[in-house]
Amino acid sequence: MRNINDYVEKYYNEPFEPYMVQIRKNNIIKQLKKYSHANILEIGCGLSPLFLDFQGFKNMVIVEPGEDFVVNARSLSENKCDIQIFQGFFEDYVDKLKKIAIEFDFIVCSSLIHEIENPQKMLAGIRDVANENTIIHINVPNAQSFHRILAKEIGMIKNIHEQSFQMKLMQRQRTYDIDLLKQEITDSGLVVIDSGTYFIKPFTHNQLQRCLDEKIIDEEVLDGLVKMEKYLPGMGAEIYVNCKKR
């Protein structure tokens, strides 16, 4: 059983993650702009809800289990009548979401299904609240990331799917490569319409944070590493898929 309070406490102290959150969010916004996005459902908003960086929507609904994250999101969205925030696990809100008078154009499930015990249950819930035109965006860390392949080649891990100490600390249940993620999606009754990876991550979160702290690299280098994916396709730090109901 996932301990959400323990997760939230450790999330505050995870090195480099604020940078990764922004890189991840930039890719989500890139995907949003490709499709209809008037009504958006965000499953899990963390400390940085999508509405902070993207305002091109009519309605946004957020479902987030972490109390600290919900308090923060409600404070940031105060007096915004186009944003609804529910506290709880998404799987427990499926019936309520089906009853609200909003047809979702775009559903964001960001950096989540690798952390939960039963991704098929969550994907079934997503399928239930989606309609035939809804785009569902899912992203997860990539087992075939440059930094994991490097770790294998120097003997730090035995295989690219091996769980690291940081993964275990953050209650992450599994590692996906693109084929495993597509299979997970297909098994749930969804169909993948496009996919990709983003951000060439040369080192671990801890190592990258040290590089930034010691001014060995700066955010311009991070921007360059985002652009580097076109030279190393499939080796980005994270995978995304956009999918629909069959």
Regions found by a protein language model. Give the residues of each.
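Conserved class I S-adenosyl-L-methionine
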Residues: 1-35, 37-46, 137-160
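Class I SAM-dependent methyltransferase SAM/SAH-binding core
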Residues: 45-93
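Acceptor-substrate binding/catalytic loop of class I
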Residues: 18, 164-180
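A short glycine-rich, Lys/Arg-flanked "PGG" loop and its adjoining helix->strand segment in the class I
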Residues: 120-135
